[in-house]
Design a protein with these regions (language model features):
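Active-site beta-strand/loop signature of hydrolases that rely on acidic residues for catalysis
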Residues: 7-12, 32-58, 115, 126-130, ...
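N-terminal secretory/membrane-targeting segments
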Residues: 2-6
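Structured beta-strand-rich core segments of catalytic domains in phosphoester-bond hydrolases
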Residues: 1, 33, 37, 43-141
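Active site of divalent-metal-dependent phosphoester/diester hydrolases
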Residues: 70-91, 155-183
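Acidic/histidine-rich helix-loop elements
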Residues: 9-29, 51, 135-164
Length: 191
């Protein structure tokens, strides 16, 4: 009996939705969305997924399942108890998802998403995690073509300090989740 399975993790960077909404012609949005269902994996974990039924280019849930049916679990949005939110983390599985759990860290749609998935006779827990971004935009700093002054250095160091503190709390929450897992093999997918 073959118990192997494949896992894919991909940060979608919101499919460049801001540019798409601005000009409706974003090559990034269309390219990412059209490529998703061609990426072969039994379990697909996405971070920063953006789904919208308003625009065909952003119907990501449909696009990923177009060629292969998947069980889908996505971060819930406020007022949406079905787990099929519009933005955040998502787990797609060719195998049945029998249990789900999530922790949401606003305001940036980060958090942890867990799915218990039955593969043959075994159950595994897949945990899709996205920790707080450090908020440092290196390209912005480099593109300004100026010497990084003391003020900019101070700002970068403050962002790093805040990011490490928040990430420490988030990692502790992840450790608590792991400590609660009993009799189930688990894998952690993180961006």
């Amino acid at each position: 009996v073959n118990n192997s399975f494949s896992v894919l993790s991909y940060n979608m960077m919101y499919c460049d939705v801001h540019k798409f909404l601005w000009d409706k012609k974003s090559i990034n949005t269309t390219g990412i969305a059209n490529t998703l269902d061609t990426l072969s994996a039994d379990i697909k974990c996405f971070q920063e997924l953006y789904n919208s039924d308003e625009f065909p280019e952003l119907q990501i849930l449909k696009k990923v399942s177009r060629r292969n049916p998947y069980y889908v679990y996505m971060h819930s949005n406020v007022g949406n108890d079905q787990g099929q939110g519009a933005i955040g983390l998502a787990i797609f599985s060719r195998y049945k998802i029998i249990n789900k759990d999530e922790v949401y860290w606003p305001p940036n749609n980060n958090g942890m998403l867990a799915a218990d998935i039955v593969i043959n006779q075994d159950t595994i827990r897949v945990i899709n995690v996205q920790l707080k971004s450090m908020g440092i935009r290196v390209n912005k700093i480099l593109n300004e073509k100026k010497e990084i002054d003391k003020e900019e250095t101070k700002n970068v160091l403050l962002k790093l300090k805040e990011g490490f503190e928040v990430r420490g709390i988030q990692v502790n929450m992840l450790e608590n989740w792991i400590d609660e897992i009993r009799d189930v093999t688990f894998i952690i997918i993180s961006h």
